[in-house]
Amino acid sequence: DSKQDMCLYQNEFDQITRTMFSQMKNACSTNQINANFMREMIPHHQGAICMSKNALHFSICPQLIPILQTIIVSQEKGVREMRALLHCI
């Protein structure tokens, strides 16, 4: 990996993690563990999606690509399901 790619990757990764942890920490808290958990986990899943997409922008080993694609699909599904469930509880 080139120094420039590593710098670009790391800068984006750092921004993603700052955003993710900030959103998790500042998630609205209620008296419901279920709602609190989902409000904290949605940004966590979104972080995993963004991290995976970030890695896919660079030259990575071919074996990692389907793993990252699976993470994106599964975490997007999880976010949709948790958002829908939050509206029901």
Task: Kindly give the residue locations of the regions a language model identified.
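His/Met- and acidic-residue-enriched segments that coordinate or traffic transition-metal cofactors
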Residues: 1-89
